[in-house]
């Protein structure tokens, strides 16, 4: 039971300080992509997150690689920066792909 409690406490810190971690992700985005906007969305923004929730982060850049492999490399750098076990779901998109998200996501918080 102590292990579960430790995991819950560890994840709770990410939710309490999600903006700080999103700023870390943004630092990597700027370094790798030069021009990037970072948004948080989903249950954490809506105040509806649960212990099983993740924190959705959307990185938008006109310099986003087309290759999914290159995007995966950037995502890996971001996760290493915040902690691989961090409960972040990082979405990497170009401005055109961002328009698709805007159709479905009601609320974004720009970092």
PLM regions: where:
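Catalytic core of pol beta-like nucleotidyltransferases
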Residues: 1-39, 45-52, 62-111
